[in-house]
Amino acid sequence: MDFFKKEILDWSIYLFLHYITRLCSNSSNSSTSHIIQEYNLVRKYEKVDKTIVDFLSRWPNLFHILEYGENILHIYFIDAANTNIMIFFLDRVLNINKNRGSFIHNLGLSSINIKEYVYQLVNNDHLDNSIRLMLENGRRTRHFLSYILDTVNIYISILINHRFYIDAEDSYGCTLLHRCIYNYKKSESESYNELIKILLNNGSDVDKKDTYGNTPFILLCKHDIDNAELFEICLENANIDSVDFNGYTPLHYVSCRNKYDFVKLLISKGANVNARNRFGTTPFYCGIIHGISLIKLYLESDTELEIDNEHIVRHLIIFDAVESLDYLLSRGVIDINYRTIYNETSIYDAVSYNAYNTLVYLLNRNGDFETITTSGCTCISEAVANNNKIIMDILLSKRPSLKIMIPSMIAITKHKQHNADLLKMCIKYTACMTDYDTLIDVQSLHQYKWYILKCFDEIDIMKRCYIKNKTVFQLVFCIKDINTLMRYGRHPSFVKCNILDVYGSCVRNIIASIRYRQRLISLLSKKLDAGDKWSCFPNEIKYKILENFNDNELTTYLKIL
């Protein structure tokens, strides 16, 4: 019959199955009485079979029967975007205006007395009055959602027996099987399990992808559905290495969920243990964060695992999985002593990801954390950037040297937004150190000329921070604002302290040389302003051009002019 052509069924199944499933999932969220919203008049029908009215009244949230009397039926539909689907459903599928028997009668639905179901439910002597009231108000709540689902299962069984196309897709590419798994709730698991088994046993495609690349089997693995029977039924016909839009396979998801039995079953069926998602993560990486049992399962598999040492260690650090890290180290699977192309180490990663337990473990195994990345960051500066005082305390307890403290505080103060309290902790720790003589010589001091002072306004406060040598205090700050640096050169605190040692004198000379250079550039620019072309340049460009000359060249040009 033409009626059973796929083109027709695609439309009817969209309403009949998907909408019913969506209604069931939404019904549990209903906490107020049913309020009739603005419905669109679909049709006015005459000579309507009472069975039709009973059938349509099962879904008051889909369409509202405004009037039924003298064989006249006014049907309103709330979803304006799909009004045409409703008209098609009522005219062509239910055959309301046809003299021959209705579609419901043809399918055998008349043998299922829905009114009797409702009557028994409402008039049950043991029924809670609140539930009866909800039914009378047209509500649908989780109290009787199982009843609705049971009824839906009956309808779907009849539809399948009449060769309905059960894998029709909605606008998101979802079939009814997708919908059932998406909306799966443990509280109604029995009804959902029955419906899913009906669909699976009748050949619903477990590999059909929705618009997000999810197959029903992937969804079953992704969601918290611990039903071994459903899993095994799906597995019989599923592509075990299918991927979603992020490249995750079913084995990725069951490993993430720590479902040991499902992981074991997939591996035994030949699932690819080295499949990588778009982030480069394999199922093994997803499973190792949960403990030793899954790790052993993967290591004992017949397939050789592809191990990216840096990636896997960082993955363990991100999840602070110390137990798994220790086990893999004891098995010789990983090595924590790596350095990236950015000179980042495992300890630096632990600080960056605030993995306290992993950091303690790594420091106890290998206490060397005095490394500087290619961007100038250190473990200490990273702890300040993360506002993590606990990690800062443990790092300072390991007694870092001045050699790493100065670059750390330079990196900290490069950022306008930093935790001042954590910076003061660094200053207190550094100021009383005496080994700065072995670190800085006068000749190399010029490299610090842009890092002399940051917290100019905090000098007086810092005097109370147990500072023994003012020059050390001066060197641990950085500054990009030349005007602030010039202000500091005239500050009374500097004038008093810069004569303490040769370093203070050198800092003073640096400031003097900067001032001298500024004067040279200013004078030369004024001399050149007499020329027509030079005067057309903006002052910022003039300054950048003249900055390329050294002091001797500037002096020579001034003499020539």
Swiss-Prot record:
Placement of ANK repeats on the sequence: 68-98, 172-208, 212-242, 246-275, 279-307, 342-371, 375-404
Provide the alphabetized UniProt keywords: ANK repeat, Repeat
Q: Specify whether Oxidoreductase is a keyword of the entry.
A: no
Q: List the disulfide bonds.
A: none
Has UniProt tagged this entry with the keyword Repeat? Answer: yes
> Which superkingdom does the taxonomy of this entry point to?
Viruses
Q: Where are the transmembrane segments?
A: none
Pfam families cross-referenced by the UniProt entry: Ank_2, PRANC
The parts of the chain that form a coiled coil are none
Family (UniProt): Belongs to the orthopoxvirus OPG189 protein family.
Q: Report the protein's function.
A: Contributes to viral release without involving rearrangement of host actin.
Q: What is this protein called?
A: Ankyrin repeat protein OPG189
Name the gene that codes for it.
Answer: OPG189
